[in-house]
From Swiss-Prot:
Ranges where the Glutamine amidotransferase type-1 domain occurs: 4-202
Reaction(s) catalysed by this chain's protein: XMP + L-glutamine + ATP + H2O = GMP + L-glutamate + AMP + diphosphate + 2 H(+)
Binding-site list for ATP: S230, G231, G232, V233, D234, S235, S236
Name the UniProt record assigns to this protein: GMP synthase [glutamine-hydrolyzing]
Gene Ontology CC annotation, any one: cytosol
UniProt keywords, alphabetically: ATP-binding, Glutamine amidotransferase, GMP biosynthesis, Ligase, Nucleotide-binding, Purine biosynthesis
GO molecular function: ATP binding; GMP synthase activity
Function, in words: Catalyzes the synthesis of GMP from XMP.
Length: 527
């Protein structure tokens, strides 16, 4: 049984980073809504509790508060930003709406000697005071600390920037240790989790595989499982894990909608059916998808059609497997957090061809989500340990509707054939061109790269003749979180090489352009 850190989410945009930083310290952490019941907290048996930041003001009525059981659980508690403010208010301190807000970098002076900050600093003043470079994002501030607390840190505009009750092991910080801008943030969280809470750092992917396999076998027994295999990272890793656990009790359904990358269907079948021995039903539904997409130009309409058609095809195939009792999905932890914590998922339309939401009710199948505790980077690590090739596990994101949203306007088979060949040349070139400064390929240096088919023709000259052919745009971005992105400054010789190959090798394209738009104002995908 692993030690667990309970994170209560008050709505911060960076709450997931808290969990990730703690897991990087090899301690299991889970995020749950701030309004969980006292009974839930007792049953969870946390080794420590963290209260996240949030957009609300403690000074207003009807804003969130922590369950009273948090402060009665007998375990260390860390309040971050709003979490510190609600801790102060609930334990008898005073919070006020600050007239001088703090957003961005700040230098914090450590005060007194506390177990939370002792020995942690970025630099010292000539007087010997320990200083920290942190990231602030708050308007409210604590005016009076609750009884039993001592001052832990301060800034010029925020006299109580951190507080500590060493007896009860309650700590509050006004800054965000989970973001990389707080230089010593990782050290602070590790100090709290490993030293103050005393959590054992035993959250390892190797151990996770053994535990997951055991749990899957207990849950499934001798019953059969069906999984929609898209070729994406999540469903691929889920298939590999399930196959290790239950072998031939797993059947995967791979739906080819005709909008996959070059040779992708063959690669998926080779990897899972031939190399791993997974039972895979390959359904070539490209004609049905193309028929439904004929004449449709609106991007969201295309997404909905592709999603609905996938559900229909998958439902038909699943209905033939009369012995299947479970439906497996590649749901990962961020999906679980959004669904449980903010209710966002319920409002989302189908965005990918492998989203099979609603099928459990339709098919009367029990739901199995073997990856629901893992973040994306953990899923990738798991995939490698399960024997999937890194080239598959670490490849760039690919939209669920596939090339359907990389072909502007109406989707035609001719357009898809041209695009997948151009895209393959671009990706192959990114993999082979090495940056001399980093000794990494440009594929590894970009977060996402792809070609886009533009349904317009331009005049060109090839040989002694005039051409009138289609245009392809290349897109490559660099990003940490895909919320914002910079266009990648690819070397000119690389772009020239790609353009030359596409124009010479893909008949029907005579012009290649490069997209230099950032996000915002543009999105990463064109549709």
């Amino acid at each position: 049984m692993h030690d667990k850190i309970l994170i209560l989410d008050f709505g911060s945009q960076v709450t997931q980073l808290i969990a990730r930083r703690i897991r990087e310290a090899h301690v299991l952490s889970e995020i749950h809504p701030h309004d969980v019941s006292d009974e839930f907290i007792r049953d969870f048996k946390p080794t420590g509790i963290i209260l996240s930041g949030g957009p609300n003001s403690v000074t207003e009525t009807d804003t969130p508060r922590a369950p009273q059981a948090v402060f009665e659980a007998g375990v260390p508690v860390l309040g971050i930003c709003y979490g510190m403010q609600t801790m102060a208010e609930q334990l008898g301190g005073k919070v006020d709406s600050g007239h001088l807000r703090e957003f961005g970098y700040a230098e914090v002076r450590a005060r007194n000697h506390t177990s939370f900050l002792d020995g942690i600093q970025d630099f010292a003043t000539p007087e010997g005071h320990g200083m920290l470079k942190v990231w602030m994002s708050h308007g409210d501030k604590v005016l009076e600390m609750p009884q039993g607390f001592q001052l832990m840190a301060s800034t010029e505009s925020c006299p109580i920037a951190a507080m500590a009750d060493e007896t009860r092991h309650f700590y509050g910080v006004q800054w965000h240790p989970e973001v990389t801008h707080t230089v010593q943030g990782r050290a602070m969280l590790e100090r709290f989790v490993l030293k103050i809470c005393g959590a054992k750092p035993d959250w390892e992917m190797g151990n996770y595989i053994d535990e997951a396999v055991e749990n899957i076998r207990k849950q499934v027994g001798d019953e059969h499982v069906i999984l929609g295999l898209s070729g994406g990272v999540d469903s691929s890793v889920a298939a590999a894990l399930l196959h290790r656990a239950i072998g031939d009790q797993l059947t995967c359904v791979f739906v080819d909608h005709g909008l996959l990358r070059l040779n992708e269907a063959e690669q998926v079948m080779s990897m899972f059916a031939d190399n791993l021995g997974v039972k895979v039903i390959h359904v070539d539904a490209s004609e049905a998808f193309m028929s439904k997409l004929k004449g449709v130009t609106d991007p969201e309409a295309k997404r909905k059609i592709i999603g609905a058609e996938f559900v229909e095809v998958f439902q038909t195939e699943a209905g033939k497997l009369t012995d299947a009792k479970w439906l497996a999905q590649g749901t990962i932890y961020p999906d679980v957090i959004e669904s449980a914590g903010k209710g966002k998922k319920a409002a989302h339309t189908i965005k990918s061809h492998h989203n099979v939401g609603g099928l459990p009710e339709t098919l009367n199948l029990k739901l199995l989500e073997p990856l629901r505790e893992l973040f994306k980077d953990e899923v990738r690590e798991l995939g490698v340990k399960l024997g999937l090739p890194p080239s598959m596990v670490y490849r760039h994101p690919f939209p669920g509707p596939g090339l359907g949203v990389r072909i502007l306007g109406e989707v035609k088979r001719e357009y898809a054939d041209l695009l997948r060949r151009a895209d393959a040349i671009f990706i192959e070139s990114l993999r082979t061109f090495i940056d001399k400064d980093t000794d990494k390929s440009w594929y590894d240096l970009t977060s996402q790269a792809f070609a886009v088919f533009l349904p317009v023709k331009s005049v060109g000259v090839m040989g002694d003749g005039r051409t009138y052919e289609y245009v392809v745009a290349l897109r490559a971005v660099q990003t940490l979180d895909f919320m914002t992105a910079h266009w990648a400054h690819l070397p000119h010789d690389l772009l020239g090489h790609v353009s030359n190959r596409i124009i010479n090798e893909v008949r029907g394209i005579n012009r290649v352009v490069y997209d230099i738009s950032g996000k915002p104002p543009a999105t990463i995908e064109w549709e």
